[in-house]
């Protein structure tokens, strides 16, 4: 539960105005604090923090219908997890002389509001729960496969195979340009157990001189080369359906940098509410399919990391050329490529906040898992 940094006495200057603004926001109001003049008696022990109040105002602005009283209450009492400021008092309301200075809520950076929003969204995730496991009778006559490699491409492939054709069988390791695979690993981690921020995560692997295990294609293939059914590395996307024994594959869904960052932050809070394995299941099976599509491109490898990625890709290509197992496609296909897209901003805080607000006011977001 949130506690404001400064709890004014009921009769202190500005307190009645502040409680009037709280009542205004609870009833769907959108007037900024600086323009508010009405008063009301105290409706609680302490005033909500400026972050919580401003987030509620933004939700009211975005909503097509009044928010439910429950959602408004949850926003006003939500904690602001992660690194950042404690709950802040409103400027113009007398309070404690200690602690952070009071603020005009409209001037708060987007990141401060995202902290509150992720707390509410994480509670939603736990309450929604997991969807039902897909069922299907096994097909003993059908070829079964296991899938590894690029985690976003592998997720799409598993979806195309379905539970009846996944299991013991040949391991299909799916590769792509290494810069794309790195972006896909980080993005998928955001929708599983969480991760460090994108650039911090890249620096971690560069400093270690290693690749994340899921996209170290040669290491993955060598682990499974002697297993029943063997292994094949597929680098040609046009050959992947044949390798999996399907007619076609749906296009892989790559969330934008804003969606991945919001998921990363939600995962951090979900991890405080449920055990690690349950968090991974909730993030990958509940949040992943429900996350709205945005116009922002996925994260991309910045110029300062491109030399390291290029060298790692060249090394991987040489290893694949000498491989003692089938490789479908040109090993040079793992070389990093420039997408030509405008890269996503390093800190897409404003877009992350916009997405969080969009989700919180969408009734479909909180529909029970099916």
Where are each of the predicted segments found?
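Anion-recognition interface
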Residues: 1-370
